[in-house]
Amino acid sequence: MDIADQTFVKKVNQKLLLKEILKNSPISRAKLSEMTGLNKSTVSSQVNTLMKENLVFEIGQGQSSGGRRPVMLVFNKKAGYSIGIDVGVDYISGILTDLEGTIILDQHHHLESNSPEITKDILIDMIHHFITRMPQSPYGLIGIGICVPGLIDKNQKIVFTPNSNWRDIDLKSFIQEKFNVPVFIENEANAGAYGEKVFGAAKNHNNIIYASISTGIGIGVIINNHLYRGVSGFSGEMGHMTIDFNGPKCSCGNRGCWELYASEKALLKSLQTKEKKVSYQDIIDLAHLNDIGTLNALQNFGFYLGIGLTNILNTFNPQAIILRNSIIESHPMVLNSIRSEVSSRVYPQLGNSYELLPSSLGKNAPALGMSSIVIEHFLDIVKM
């Protein structure tokens, strides 16, 4: 075996060992050898390398099953820190996490204007806020992940955001030049799907759909544990599938799009009158007070969500659909309405093969997904 091949094998072994340490900390070298099939000298050598790289450390002795007590190893989650940011239509939410995704700091801004220039200024301030308060660590800031609700191409350039009207914006290069760390740009629903897969309700599923229901509707698709992005990176824009061929005009240029009937924007519109402007918080409060008009609107909201979700279930046949929406998460009647509509329409052979679940990470799902993408890239670079 030549030197290049030996180096490659060592790196593959390091990756395998770190994966097991991440999943099973604390763990002994002997157990690592047993679980990976690598011999004890290889395990010892590669663990020493990981320790020199500050990714693994010893925490003392574990229980013995006979003979000497083993020295236990754990992953060093404080070796570096990651920033994940969710840029919505009218907000920016950011988090600083350690390498296991534990949130160390968070910050939220309401956007009075969603122009790219104003948004960039707030992003820079937020990132500076996290960096100046970040704990000391061997690797410092390992990267920044930012998601937006819109079309992201294969080069991570923002092509179009229907509800903010951003077009052809290279946010990745702009942030990378400012902070000189790896930067990742992703669609918001894809980021949310990844967050739920790594940390949340979809942890134990291989095939899931994540539906982000806010001003618009975005869908994140995970197939066999991998994000599905499509040929151009534009998959998941199912908020713009037609459910009424002769319906009203949408901002995307189509007519009768699903999100015109089943988004937060549509819900607010259905309750507003010339005399009364209704806020999202008003809807939550009125629903808790059992206001009849509000409850009827929420029932209708669930009805239209159920129609679109039925199409998605029949198309993808996932194990679960994770629903991210504050009202769905706080009002069981909306989820019940969705489930009722779906069960009455879905392909009968699907039976009970799927689950409809509220998000377990809530508003943090997209930012956690972005932080996870940054962390995975960092660990690949360090090890490979």
UniProtKB/Swiss-Prot annotation:
DNA-binding span(s): 29-48
Keywords annotated in UniProt: Carbohydrate metabolism, DNA-binding, Repressor, Transcription, Transcription regulation, Xylose metabolism
Cited CDD domains: ASKHA_ATPase_ROK_BsXylR-like (cd24076)
Domain of life: Bacteria
Gene Ontology annotations of biological process type: D-xylose metabolic process
Family membership: Belongs to the ROK (NagC/XylR) family.
Name of protein: Xylose repressor
Organism: Bacillus spizizenii (strain ATCC 23059 / NRRL B-14472 / W23)
